[in-house]
């Protein structure tokens, strides 16, 4: 089954391994499609929409400026005072249709972390998470409703894939986060969104066209986009080799995060099933090509699972793969999910793994976990059942403790990882 680009409706060709083996990217499929939205359109396309409504082309640029620069929502037409009142609603209906409906919002970490469960107009479910730190604000976005990669320790993978998200559905998650931060709806006062990580639901590179278009919208300056720095964007992948190589040629110096989780094929075949198509050596070869082309350090994601992949022998094997490379290891103590009996490595085991990598000269970070109490941490996003939408003005507060790994002293990365010194 081919993957469909929601913004165009055209099927993408499924990625293949070098030997020509097709890769199945879906477990389930829903025939849904998002409405056409301003964020799906080029400047000329959106101007054509305005003209088709009998309005001057520049009206579309005004709407885009309100959306990207002023972060005004479609249900706030009264704030768009430069648009004639009689012309506002037709323009908004055509360019800013409703894409995502909030179903539930939860907060933790003293209000510094907020998870929103969304429902699309065709009933698909997804989640995004906003996280505020002392020096930055990050949103973790979904690129698909569900995921077809089938990783057994990940709640999203256990649920299967519903459909790809459109470019606009991805961008809307980011615009919403920027709006929340600007309007002081998160603890800590007003701030600007600085980082976007494609680490929510889905495999971003399996929805390649929509994700690339979203990255371009996020980095373009208003009224074409949000004007974020590409260096503040991170795209995670389980290792779709052809797509990694293609990404290197896009001229977008985003951070590539490779979800490795094991240094050997025997174990990784079990933890990351796509490894049977592209083994570890091929995935890392593509990652090193990406680093060479972009000059960006590759983040190697590694979930520490008690008694599975956390022994020092595997730490040595991982170091052998990475020594001398433009990369760092981001260790993630496994977060609990309902469908898995695995658990995080014990603190002593985590420390031993970190020590072994550091002794080999590998830059190592340990994720400063956010959102575990509200199932918003890495690997926990599974989308709550779509029910009656509710307003998110007063998110439910759950817990307040922030997990600090090992009491380590050091700086943190834009993704919230603690650099151990």
Swiss-Prot record:
Signal peptide: none annotated. It is found in: Cytoplasm. [4Fe-4S] cluster binds at residues 147, 151, 154. Its EC number is 2.1.1.192. It holds the Pfam family Radical_SAM. S-adenosyl-L-methionine binds at residues 202-203, 236, 259-261, 335. One of its GO terms (cellular component) is cytoplasm. Disulfide bonds join 140-378. Residues 387-396 have a biased composition (Basic and acidic residues). Residues 133-372 form the Radical SAM core domain. It catalyses: adenosine(2503) in 23S rRNA + 2 reduced [2Fe-2S]-[ferredoxin] + 2 S-adenosyl-L-methionine = 2-methyladenosine(2503) in 23S rRNA + 5'-deoxyadenosine + L-methionine + 2 oxidized [2Fe-2S]-[ferredoxin] + S-adenosyl-L-homocysteine; adenosine(37) in tRNA + 2 reduced [2Fe-2S]-[ferredoxin] + 2 S-adenosyl-L-methionine = 2-methyladenosine(37) in tRNA + 5'-deoxyadenosine + L-methionine + 2 oxidized [2Fe-2S]-[ferredoxin] + S-adenosyl-L-homocysteine. Keywords: 4Fe-4S, Cytoplasm, Disulfide bond, Iron, Iron-sulfur, Metal-binding, Methyltransferase, rRNA processing, S-adenosyl-L-methionine, Transferase, tRNA processing. Binds 1 [4Fe-4S] cluster. The cluster is coordinated with 3 cysteines and an exchangeable S-adenosyl-L-methionine. Its cofactor is [4Fe-4S] cluster. Residues 1-23, 383-421 are annotated as: Disordered. One of its GO terms (biological process) is rRNA base methylation. The active site is at residues 127, 378. PROSITE patterns: RADICAL_SAM. GO terms for molecular function: 4 iron, 4 sulfur cluster binding; metal ion binding; rRNA (adenine(2503)-C2-)-methyltransferase activity; rRNA binding; tRNA (adenine(37)-C2)-methyltransferase activity; tRNA binding. The keyword Iron-sulfur applies. Reaction proceeds by a ping-pong mechanism involving intermediate methylation of a conserved cysteine residue. Belongs to the radical SAM superfamily. RlmN family. Specifically methylates position 2 of adenine 2503 in 23S rRNA and position 2 of adenine 37 in tRNAs. This is Probable dual-specificity RNA methyltransferase RlmN. It comes from Frankia casuarinae (strain DSM 45818 / CECT 9043 / HFP020203 / CcI3). The lineage of its organism: Bacteria, Bacillati, Actinomycetota, Actinomycetes, Frankiales.
């Amino acid at each position: 089954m081919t993957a469909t680009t929601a913004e165009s409706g055209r099927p993408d060709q499924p990625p293949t391994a070098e030997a020509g083996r097709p890769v199945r990217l879906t477990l389930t499929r829903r025939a849904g499609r998002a409405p056409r939205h301003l964020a799906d359109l080029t400047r000329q396309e959106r101007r054509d929409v305005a003209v088709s409504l009998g309005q001057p082309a520049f009206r579309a640029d005004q709407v885009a400026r309100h959306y990207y620069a002023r972060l005004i929502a479609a249900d706030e037409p009264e704030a768009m005072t430069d648009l004639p009142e009689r012309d506002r609603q037709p323009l908004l209906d055509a360019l800013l249709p409703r894409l995502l409906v909030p179903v539930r919002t939860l907060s933790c970490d003293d209000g510094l972390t907020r998870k929103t469960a969304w429902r699309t107009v065709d009933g698909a479910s997804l989640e995004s998470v906003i996280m505020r730190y002392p020096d930055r604000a990050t949103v973790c976005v979904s690129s698909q409703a569900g995921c077809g990669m089938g990783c057994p320790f990940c709640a999203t993978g256990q649920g299967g894939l519903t459909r790809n998200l459109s470019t606009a559905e991805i961008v809307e998650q980011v615009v919403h986060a920027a709006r929340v931060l600007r309007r002081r709806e998160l603890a800590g006062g007003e701030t600007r969104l600085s980082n976007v990580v494609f680490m929510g639901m889905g495999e971003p590179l399996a929805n390649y066209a929509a994700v690339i278009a979203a990255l371009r919208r996020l980095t373009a300056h208003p009224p074409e986009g949000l004007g974020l720095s590409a260096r503040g964007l991170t795209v995670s992948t389980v290792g779709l080799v052809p797509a990694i190589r293609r990404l290197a040629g896009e001229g977008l110096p985003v951070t590539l995060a490779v979800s490795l989780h094991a240094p050997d094929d025997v174990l990784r075949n079990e933890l990351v099933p796509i490894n049977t198509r592209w083994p570890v050596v091929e995935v890392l070869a593509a990652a090193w090509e990406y680093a060479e082309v972009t000059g960006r350090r590759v983040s190697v994601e590694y979930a520490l699972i008690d008694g599975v992949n956390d022994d020092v022998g595997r730490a040595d094997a991982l170091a052998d793969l990475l020594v001398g490379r433009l990369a760092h290891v981001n260790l993630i103590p496994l977060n609990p999910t309902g469908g898995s009996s695995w658990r995080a490595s014990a603190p002593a085991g985590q420390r031993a793994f970190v020590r072994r990598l550091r002794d080999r000269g590998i830059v190592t970070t340990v994720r400063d976990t956010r959102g575990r109490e509200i199932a918003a941490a890495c690997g926990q996003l599974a989308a709550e059942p779509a029910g009656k939408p509710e307003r998110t003005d007063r998110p439910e507060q759950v817990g307040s403790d922030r997990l600090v790994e090992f009491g380590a002293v050091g700086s943190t990365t834009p993704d919230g990882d603690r650099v151990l010194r």
